[in-house]
Amino acid sequence: MSLLILVVADEPDVEVLFRQRFRRDLRAGRFTMEFAQSGPDALQRISCATDVPLILILSDINMPGMSGLELLPRAKALRPDVPVIMITTYEGAETKRKALENGAQALLTKPIDFVTLRNEIDLCVERAA
């Protein structure tokens, strides 16, 4: 069974970076990653993620159109069972409060600490097993 992680970010280099950082996991089939470049695209993918178990959503906060903070409650309404980790350049107290109040599991700052992110992913994979 292949597990799905959805990464939501408007910057195209995010996909290249994540595929590089998690290449062994992806090659081994431990999980797959899909990439959405906007909030509406992410919501469509979340709604359609029925073929494989969606185990984690990683979302940037600062995106044009629908921000990650606007996406978060809508994603949780569609899939309350799926943890969401928010990613931001600026970790202000207000941003963190809003993210956690709306159901985010965690808030990571850029540049991303991939050791911390890997630990979060490992927990999600273990829970899904």
Model regions and ranges:
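Alpha4 helix (beta4-alpha4-beta5 surface) of REC/receiver domains from two-component response regulators
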Residues: E15, E70, E91-A106, N119
